[in-house]
Amino acid sequence: MPAKGPLTPQQLSLINRYWRAANYLSVGQIYLMKNPLLREPLQPEHIKPRLLGHWGTTPGLNFIYAHLNRIIQQRNANVIYICGPGHGGPGMVANTYLEGTYSEIYPAISEDEAGMERLFRQFSFPGGIPSHAAPETPGSIHEGGELGYALVHAYGAAFDNPDLVVACVVGDGEAETGALATSWHSNKFLNPARDGAVLPILHLNGYKIANPTVLARLSDDDLDNLFRGYGYEPFFVEGSEPADMHQKMAATLDTIFQRIQDIKKNADVHSPERPRWPMIILRSPKGWTGPKTVDGLVVENYWRAHEVPVANCRENDAHRKILEDWMKSYDPSDLFDEKGALKPELRALAPKGEARIGANPHANGGLLRKELHMPDFRQYAVNVTEPGAIEAQSTKILGDFLRDVMKLNETEKNFRIFGPDETASNRLGSVLEATNRVWMAETLDMDDHLAADGRVMEVLSEHLCQGWLEGYLLSGRHGFFSCYEAFIHIIDSMFNQHAKWLQVARELEWRKPISSLNYLLTSHVWRQDHNGFSHQDPGFVDLVANKSADIARVYFPPDANTLLWVGDHCLKTWNRVNVIVAGKQPEPQWLTMAEAEKHCEAGLGIWEWAGTEDGLEPDIVMACAGDVPTMETLAAVDLLRQSLPHLRIRVVNVVDLMVLQSPHQHPHGISDEEFDRMFTTNRPVIFAYHGYPYLIHRLVYKRTNHSNFHVRGFIEQGTTTTPFDMTVLNELDRFHLAMEAVERLPLGESVAKPLIDNFTEKLALHKDYIRQHGEDMPEIRDWKWTWPR
C-alpha cells in the first residue's frame, strides 16, 4: 500500500532519490579517495588510509535538508539551517554540493566525476576540509563541534529578521548540555511582530558516542508535556520506512509553515502575545540506511553507527564488500548522469539563487552588515581640568553613549545590548531611556522597562547572552555584551569556539567580515570587595590573549574619556573579539578628551604630568594597566615624590594590552625601539596590572628590559573586605608598590629602611583600622592627586 500524505508518487520518488544522493555523497566523503561513482570494483587503493567522520547523524540531517528544500520551493520561504550535530558535516557539504552552491564557491569541486572525486578526497584529509560544519561549509553559521549552542545561535539569527525561518536541528546528545537546556526558553524573547521564526527539530536517533540519550528514552507523552511546558507545540515524525517518513515529514512541514505564517500574520505590532511556536520531534534510526550489522554486531539504530560503521575497508575484504554493497544500495547511476552530475529532475528539487540554504546571505552575515550610525563620543566627555580633580562612574558615561547608539540605529534595527541581569548594575541603565528590556512572558503592573519591542536582552544565563549575540553577529548585525568580570568565565569555551570560527572565516574570501564581539567586563575584581572571593577573578583576559593575534584585543581604559574612545572604536571594528575591562564605581578622572584620544590611539603612553623625569633618563618606571592599578600607581608615585623629591620617576599607562608584544607577535605591538624608549633598557619597571601578573611577563619576555620588570597584580587573595584591602591582600596597593620601588633603587640602607618601615607601619595601621571601623582609613578614602601639571 503506498504511503499516504501530500506527496504524489512522482514527488515521493524524486525526494527519496535526492535523499539517496545526499547519503551517497556523505558516505563517499568518509570513505573514498578514488572511484567516486563505483564504475569499477572497489579496491583498497580507492579507500582513504584513515577513515574519519560521523555517519550516524548524517542521514537524518540529509532527510531534513531535502524536505526544507521542498518547503522553500513551495512557499518561497527564506530559510537557513543550523546543524547542531555539526559532526554530521558530510551531510551539510553534500547538500550544498547537490544544490550547486559548493561548486560556485569552490570551482575546483566541479559538478562532474572529477569534482566528485575531489569532494570525497578533501573531506577530513590533509590540505582538505574539516569534519564538521565549519566556516568552510556554505550556509553554516554554527560549526557544532562543541555541543550546546545550536538553538541559542538560531534565536540570535532570528532576532530582527522578520522574514527568516531558522531551522535548527538539535541532536539528542546535545540536548543533554546545560546551554541547550536553557536555550528552549529563548522563545520568551522572540517577538513574532518583528523577529523571524525558529523551528527547533529535536532529532532523536537514540544514541550518543556509546550510550543512549535521555530524551530518546522518554515516552511521546512525556516529551509532549515537557516541550509544551517550555511553550512549544510539538509535532512528532517517527519511523524508519523511507516512503512513510517522507510523507509524514512533508505533511508536518506543510502544517508548521502555515502555522508560522498565521502566527506572524496575527501578531499585533503594538502588543504582541507570545505564541506557542511549533517544533518537530524527529525519531529516526541512527545510521539510517547504513549497514544493519558488521561482524555480527548491530550497527544501524545503535551507537556503533555513530562514526565510521565499517572500519577496516582497506585491509578487510569482507568489510570492503559491505561498504561497496552499502554505497551501491543508493544506486548512483539513478542519481548522477554519465558525467557525474546530478540528474536534472533531481537538481530541480533544489531552490535557486539565494533561496538555496547554502547561498542564503543570512548565513554569510557580512553580506548584509551595515555600519552603525554613531554619535560623536566626544560629546560625552568628562571635563577634566586637572588630573584626578574630579570623580565619575566611567561605565555610566559609556551608558549615555550607548543609549544614543541605540537611538541612532532604531530605524535599522541592527543593534542590541546583552547582559545576564546586569545592565543596571553595571551602570548602563541610561540605555533604558532609549529602549526597554525584551520580554514576551507575563508582565505585572509593578514591572518596569519590560516590553515586547525592547532591544536590551537580559536573562540570567551568560550562555544565552553569548549565544544570542553570536547568532546576531553571524547574521550581519551589531551588539555589546556587559558582564561581571568573574562570571564571564562561564562562557570561556563559547568564546574559544567563536574565536576559532573568526580565525578560519578571515581566510575565506567569500565569507564577508562580521561585526566584532564586544565585551565590557565590569564589577571587576578590585571592586568586588562586597561579594567576596567567588566574585573575584580577572583571568578571562588570559584566555583571550591565547587566541590568534588577528582576533584578540584587550583594553584597560583608566577613566571615562578613555573608555568612551575604546567603546566607540570597538563598535566600529569587525572580525575581532574586543574585551574592555573598566570599573563602574566612582573613580578619579585623569585625562582630557584630547589627551585620551592621543593616548588610546597609541595604546600606551608616558604621563609626563605624573612623573618627575624632566626630560632626563628616569631612575625608575612606574607602569600600570587598569583603572584601580592606575590609581594605586599614582598614589605610590605621590608617596615617592614626597619621600624622595629628587627621584626621577616615569609613569607609563597601558590601555591596549597587546601593544606590549612585538609587531611580529601582534599587529598592535610596538617596535623594540619604541618599547625601549618607553620602558628604558636598564631601569627597574614596577608594573601594576589589573589581572594575573604572569600575563605581563609573557607579553614582554622578549624585550630588552624584561629582567627588570616586576609585575604586581591579582595573586588569588580575596574575601569580603574593603576596596583598598583587596589591593593590600594582593600586594598591589600604593604602599607595596612604593616599597617595591624603594627596594629596586640603589638608595642605600640609610635611606631605604626608614621608608620601608614607614610604609610597613601604614599597612599595619590599615589592617587594624578596617577591623575596627569596617571601612578604609580616611587618608585612603579621601586621597587625591594634587601635584600640578
UniProtKB/Swiss-Prot annotation:
EC number of the protein: 4.1.2.-
Requisite cofactors: thiamine diphosphate
GO biological process per UniProt: carbohydrate metabolic process
InterPro entries attached to this UniProt entry: Phosphoketolase, THDP-binding, Transketo_C/PFOR_II, Xul5P/Fru6P_PKetolase, Xul5P/Fru6P_PKetolase_C, Xul5P/Fru6P_PKetolase_CS, Xul5P/Fru6P_PKetolase_N, Xul5P/Fru6P_PKetolase_ThDP_BS
SUPFAM superfamilies linked to this entry: Thiamin diphosphate-binding fold (THDP-binding) (SSF52518)
Keyword tags: Lyase, Thiamine pyrophosphate
Record-level Gene Ontology MF annotations: aldehyde-lyase activity
Pfam family, one: XFP
Keyword check for Lyase: yes
Domain of life: Bacteria
Enzyme class: lyase
Similarity-based family: Belongs to the XFP family.
Protein name: Probable phosphoketolase
Species of origin: Brucella abortus (strain 2308)
